Amino acid sequence: SLEGVGVEGSDKVTELALNNNVITCHNYATDGPLKFSKTFDLAWSTEFVEHVEEQYLDNFVATFKCAKYLAITYAYIKQYGHHHVNENTEDYWLEQITSRGFTYDEETTRELRQKTIEDWKDPRSPVDQSKVEGWEAPYHFATRGLFFKNDLLL
């Protein structure tokens, strides 16, 4: 069976979510680290890490450490967006995550990025790409996705 949990920083978003029974509302800046008592196969974090100040990195990495594998995307410098307080480079995120007990899996990252692009180009895609002006590879993972292995759990 498939089981998952979500972590959201906004009370309002948590309340409005259709699946709020599996979402934990948690602010990594004010609530500290969040650790789950169970281990998950995968932690998936899309366009989140740039929303937390660098001083609180350990707080959300504690959540990531509850999974055997980690896939993240990040906002690049000057991407701009609501509460983007830590836009940074790929090298920065590689250093931050690997220095906290994960191993970067370059081969899997490359494969997942390629698969993301293939899915985007697939005419059966649920998103009508013709209506998205100027997007050559719109899915975040295609250009800013990173995949890691958790050395502590593998």
Residue ranges, per PLM feature:
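Conserved SAM-binding loop
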Residues: S1-H83, E87-L94, T98, F148-N150
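Core SAM-dependent methyltransferase catalytic element
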Residues: E118-L154
